[in-house]
Amino acid sequence: MTDKMIDLHGAAALVPDGATMSFGGFTTQRHPMAFVYEMIRLGRRDLYLFGHSPGGDWDILIGAGAVKRVELAYEADEAFNTVGPRWRRAVERGQIEWEDYSNFSMVARFTAGAMGIPFMPVRSLLGSDVLAKETLLPGERKADPRTAARKSHVMTSPFDPRDRVVLVPAVRTDFAVLHVQKAAADGTLRFEGQTFADVQQALAADTVIVTAEEIVEADTLRREPERNPIPFFAVNHVCHVPFGAHPYAVYNYYDYDPVQLKEYHEAARDDASFARYLDKYVRGVRDHGQYLEAVGGRARLDMIKASPACGYSPELKRRRL
């Protein structure tokens, strides 16, 4: 089997300016944050992001000036903020191009891309302002081959004239970047807990990069093939990055870090304090190891360690510190 192992810096360096991307995870769960920070250190620009429910992975990239356009349903860190602060600021200032969908319709778009079909029918947008409003103009869409020609299309069912559905365009990206609990060097992956839309996003991407808490033997994972929903041949690169989702949670490994998330959201409200945050935790550290030391090292990481019985930390103070 091919050895697909690569270091984090080398993996992030594969992504050029202007790439189309999706990131795995959901709000405060299992985002590939170490990879995101490495892209910021590399100075990436003009990225096109597609997602259903991203969190601070998108927010910090947007704040760092790395993103040109997003197509999404929601971007926030649940209990810490209803809308990502840098995302909100970028929209209010007209600094980012964006298009709005529902959660289900974005997952349907990834599913269409994974299946190799041009669109997917859904009902979830009917009767909503999401369907009625389109922020990307037809001229912008026509001029950019990375953007669908239309946001959506309502059609009458060819099987029942009383029935209507919405067609949403497929999403295919240059890169999908996921963080998982376990991976093998050949690209075999193990998700523990919810997969969210990671499987669809991976199969809808030309290149799949995975960061993992643990690297294990492929034969170990193959003993339970039903728990490996992405085929090894769909994965291009694997990085060993313990605590690679911090400050977000990885089920069975660690909870999200409320101290760090609180610090981020307080800093991200203001341009100057956000710049200081980036300097302290991203641009001012050499690599992921230095980042973990900067946020508090072993003492902080032990604080968020998951209980073997629960898969998360039941003792963690989650909101008001």
Where are these regions (language model features)?
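Conserved alpha/beta enzyme-core scaffold
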Residues: 1-321
